[in-house]
Amino acid sequence: MPTHSDLPNGDAAVFQDNSFHGEDTYITRELNRRIAIDAVFDGATGRGGGDASGYAAKTLQEATVDSTAGVTALLEMAHQRLFQRGRGRFFLTTATVTLKIGSMLHVVNIGDSPVFLIRGHDIMPLTGTAQGATFLGIA
């Protein structure tokens, strides 16, 4: 059953239905009055995807970040640890992260999950979608 969560940083919501695979993880976190981070991780492969999405989310949940460079560095660290743990296989996840700093919203997107900006009745794609075969972490 989908769950709904109002985010602390404005008019936003997350809808999540993990009844099929349970490999998705999301976080919503207000670091201070100016900075908030929201992220969705979609675990892939059906084998270690849930572990990967959970680990990536925990990494961001426990850290203090104030820039997209900080988000990118944390995700790179999580990637290296998961890659070593799985020897290049199985522990895979996408990451879609928004970092609100003041009135600016920054997006970091890794993988094939599309990102859309919705304002009123306008829907604008911020990223494309993957087309064709995608080869994930096979060493």
PLM region spans:
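PP2C/PPM-type serine/threonine phosphatase catalytic domain
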Residues: 1-139
